[in-house]
C-alpha cells in the first residue's frame, strides 16, 4: 500500500494549527519533467510548537482486526527514519495519480529543523491521526465491500434457492399432471372396459331373450299347427269330392282383371292430379320401398327389420286414403315383380319374401285384394285358370309378355316367370300366421288354396295342358309339398300321386320337360327323399 503525501498533508488545510512554513519548489533545481508546480507541504508552526508544551495524549487502543491490518501494512518500513540522512533534492514531486509510486524527496533542511527543534512529535501525531482516519475509511470501505459481497452472495444464494424451488415446484407440477393424466387414462380405460362388459352382457341377454322368444313362438306354432291340421282334416273329404266349376273360376279371373282396371281408374290416375305434397311423399316412399325386397336374406332378424320399416312407411300414408291405397298397390306390384325376377332364378328366396308378404297382408287387410289382383294378372294359374293361347287375347290373359322387339317371349322365359310367382304363392299358403295375429286373424291365403290349384289343374282339359302346367306343379312341389302332406295326410298323398303319376302319364306323348322333372320329384318322395326349402336362420 502506498500513500501520497499531498493526501496526508493537505487533508487538514483548514486547521489553525498548521501553516505554510516552507516551499520545496525550486524552478532552478527541479528535475521533474512535468510543467505543473509541485505541491506544498503544510507543517505545524515550529515557533508555536516550540513554545507550547506537549500534552501527553492517552494511549489509543485499536481494534484487534485493525491492529492486525496495520501490522500487515508495515507502515514503519514505509516512513523515513529520523536519524537517516535524506538525499537532497531541489523539490518534492507528488504525482497527481494515486496509483503512481511516490518518489523520494529530499528534505534535509526540514529534518534538521525537526531534529533541532524537537517538533517531530506533533508531526507524527498529525500523520498518525491522518493515517488513522485513512485507515478507518479503508476499514469502512472494506466493511462495505464485504457487506456488498455478502449481500451479493446472499442474493445469488436466494436466487439459486428460488430457482431450485421453482424447479422443484415445476417438477412437482409435471409429476402431478402426469399422475392426473395417468389416473384419467386409467379411469377412461376402466369406463371403457365397463361399457364393453355392459354391452356384451346386454347383447347376451338380448340373444337369450330372442332365443327364448323364438322357442316359445315355435312351440305355439307347433300347437297351432296341430289345431290347424285337425280343422283341415275335417275339410279334406269335402275338398276331395268337390267338382271343379270352371265357370266360377272364369268369373273370378275376370273379377280380378276388372279390379286391375279399377285400380288404375280410382287410384293410379287420381294420384297424378293429387296435391304436390302427397305426390312428393309417395315418391319418397317409393324410392325407400323399392330396394327393401332386394335386401331380404335368409335371416329372420333382417326380415323383422324390413317388416318394421315397411310398416312405418305405410302407416305414414294412412292419413290420406288415396295415398294409402296407392302405396299398397305399389307394394303388391313390387312383391309380384320380385317373384318373377328373383324367385325364378333362386326359388328358396321365396321363403323370406313369402313371410314378409304374409305379414303385410295380415297387418294391412286392404292389401289382400290388391295383391291377389296382381297375382292373377301376372299368373292366372294361382286360381287354376287356363285358356287357349293360340290367340292374341288368350296369351294376354295367361300373362305372356312381349320382348323389346314386340315379339312374344320364349317358352322358357315364360315358364320361369310363372314358376317363380307360383313358388311365392305356394309358400304363402303353407306358412303359419305371425305369432301376434294367430288368435285375432284368419289366414288370408290358407293352404286350402294349394289344394284348389292342384285339383283344378288335374281337372283341366288335356288339350289345354302345356309344359307350363308341369313347371308350376314342380315349383309348387318344391315350395309346399312337405307341409301339404302334413296338413292333409293321406288325402294329400293321393293328390300328389294323381299329379305326379297319372297326369304325367296322360301327357307322356308330349314329352314335356316339366312333366319329366315332376316324375323325378314323385320318385324322390316315394323313396323318402323329399326335400323342401331350408328354414330361415335367427
From Swiss-Prot:
Membrane topology recorded in Swiss-Prot or TrEMBL: Peripheral membrane protein
Alphabetical list of Pfam families matching this protein: GLE1
Residue span of motif Bipartite nuclear localization signal 2: 272-288
Start and end residues of each stretch annotated as Interactions with NUP42, DBP5 and GFD1: 257-538
GO biological process, one term: poly(A)+ mRNA export from nucleus
Low complexity bias spans: 21-33
Region (Disordered): 9-39, 151-226
GO molecular function: enzyme activator activity; inositol hexakisphosphate binding; phospholipid binding; translation initiation factor binding
A Gene Ontology term for the protein's cellular component: cytoplasm
Coiled-coil ranges from the UniProt annotation: 131-244
Main location: nucleus
Short motif (Bipartite nuclear localization signal 1): ranges: 154-170
Keywords: Coiled coil, Membrane, mRNA processing, mRNA transport, Nuclear pore complex, Nucleus, Protein transport, Translocation, Transport
Subcellular location: Nucleus, Nuclear pore complex; Nucleus membrane
Record-linked InterPro entries: GLE1, GLE1-like_sf
Job of this protein: Functions as a component of the nuclear pore complex (NPC). NPC components, collectively referred to as nucleoporins (NUPs), can play the role of both NPC structural components and of docking or interaction partners for transiently associated nuclear transport factors. It is specifically involved in a terminal step of poly(A)+ mRNA transport through the NPC probably by binding the ATP-dependent RNA helicase DBP5 and GFD1 at the cytoplasmic side of the NPC.
Miscellaneous remark of the record: Present with 1040 molecules/cell in log phase SD medium.
Quaternary structure note: Component of the nuclear pore complex (NPC). NPC constitutes the exclusive means of nucleocytoplasmic transport. NPCs allow the passive diffusion of ions and small molecules and the active, nuclear transport receptor-mediated bidirectional transport of macromolecules such as proteins, RNAs, ribonucleoparticles (RNPs), and ribosomal subunits across the nuclear envelope. Due to its 8-fold rotational symmetry, all subunits are present with 8 copies or multiples thereof. GLE1 interacts with the NUP82 subcomplex via NUP42. It also interacts with GFD1 and the ATP-dependent RNA helicase DBP5.
Protein family: Belongs to the GLE1 family.
Name under which the protein is recorded: mRNA export factor GLE1
Organism annotation: Saccharomyces cerevisiae (strain ATCC 204508 / S288c) (Baker's yeast)
Amino acid at each position: 500500500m502506498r500513500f501520497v503525501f499531498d493526501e496526508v498533508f493537505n487533508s487538514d488545510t483548514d486547521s489553525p494549527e498548521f501553516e505554510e512554513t516552507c516551499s520545496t519548489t525550486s524552478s532552478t533545481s527541479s528535475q521533474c519533467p512535468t510543467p505543473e508546480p509541485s505541491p506544498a507541504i503544510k507543517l505545524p508552526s515550529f515557533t508555536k510548537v516550540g513554545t507550547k508544551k506537549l500534552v501527553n495524549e492517552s494511549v489509543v487502543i485499536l481494534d484487534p482486526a485493525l491492529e492486525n491490518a496495520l501490522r500487515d501494512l508495515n507502515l514503519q518500513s514505509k516512513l523515513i527514519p529520523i536519524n537517516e540522512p535524506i538525499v537532497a533534492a531541489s523539490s518534492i514531486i507528488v504525482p497527481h495519480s494515486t496509483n503512481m509510486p511516490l518518489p523520494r524527496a529530499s528534505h534535509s533542511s526540514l529534518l534538521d529543523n525537526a531534529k533541532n527543534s524537537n517538533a517531530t512529535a506533533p508531526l507524527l501525531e498529525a500523520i498518525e491521526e491522518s493515517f488513522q482516519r485513512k485507515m478507518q475509511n479503508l476499514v469502512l470501505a472494506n466493511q462495505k465491500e464485504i457487506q456488498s459481497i455478502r449481500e451479493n452472495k446472499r442474493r445469488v444464494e436466494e436466487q439459486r434457492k428460488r430457482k431450485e424451488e421453482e424447479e422443484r415446484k415445476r417438477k412437482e407440477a409435471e409429476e402431478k399432471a402426469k399422475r392426473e393424466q395417468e389416473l384419467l387414462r386409467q379411469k377412461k380405460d376402466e369406463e371403457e372396459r365397463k361399457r364393453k362388459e355392459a354391452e356384451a352382457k346386454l347383447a347376451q341377454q338380448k340373444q337369450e331373450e330372442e332365443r327364448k322368444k323364438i322357442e316359445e313362438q315355435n312351440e305355439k306354432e307347433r300347437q297351432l299347427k296341430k289345431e290347424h291340421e285337425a280343422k283341415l282334416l275335417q275339410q279334406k273329404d269335402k275338398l276331395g269330392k268337390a267338382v271343379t266349376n270352371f265357370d266360377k273360376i272364369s268369373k273370378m279371373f275376370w273379377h280380378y282383371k276388372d279390379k286391375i282396371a279399377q285400380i288404375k281408374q280410382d287410384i293410379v290416375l287420381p294420384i297424378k292430379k293429387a296435391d304436390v305434397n302427397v305426390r312428393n311423399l309417395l315418391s319418397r316412399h317409393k324410392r325407400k320401398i323399392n330396394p327393401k325386397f332386394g335386401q331380404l336374406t335368409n335371416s329372420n332378424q333382417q326380415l323383422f327389420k324390413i317388416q318394421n320399416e315397411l310398416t312405418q312407411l305405410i302407416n305414414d300414408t294412412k292419413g290420406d286414403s288415396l295415398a294409402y291405397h296407392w302405396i299398397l298397390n305399389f307394394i303388391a306390384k313390387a312383391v309380384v315383380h320380385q317373384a318373377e325376377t328373383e324367385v325364378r332364378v333362386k326359388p328358396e328366396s321365396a321363403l323370406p319374401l313369402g313371410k314378409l308378404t304374409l305379414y303385410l297382408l295380415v297387418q294391412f287387410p286392404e292389401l289382400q285384394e290388391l295383391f291377389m289382383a296382381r297375382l292373377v294378372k301376372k299368373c292366372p294359374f294361382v286360381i287354376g285358370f287356363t285358356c287357349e293361347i293360340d290367340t292374341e287375347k288368350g296369351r294376354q290373359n295367361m300373362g305372356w309378355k312381349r320382348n323389346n322387339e314386340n315379339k312374344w317371349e320364349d317358352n322358357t322365359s315364360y315358364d320361369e316367370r310363372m314358376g317363380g310367382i307360383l313358388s311365392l304363392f305356394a309358400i304363402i299358403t303353407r306358412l303359419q300366421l305371425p305369432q301376434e295375429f294367430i288368435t285375432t286373424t284368419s289366414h288370408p291365403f290358407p293352404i286350402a288354396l294349394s289344394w284348389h290349384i292342384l285339383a283344378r289343374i288335374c281337372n283341366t282339359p288335356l288339350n289345354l295342358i302345356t309344359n307350363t302346367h308341369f313347371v308350376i306343379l314342380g315349383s309348387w312341389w318344391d315350395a309346399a309339398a312337405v307341409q301339404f302332406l302334413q296338413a292333409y295326410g293321406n288325402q294329400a298323398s293321393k293328390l300328389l300321386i294323381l299329379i305326379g303319376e297319372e297326369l304325367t302319364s296322360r301327357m307322356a306323348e308330349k314329352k314335356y320337360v316339366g312333366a319329366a322333372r315332376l316324375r323325378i320329384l314323385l320318385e324322390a318322395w316315394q323313396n323318402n327323399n323329399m326335400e323342401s326349402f331350408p328354414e330361415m336362420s335367427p
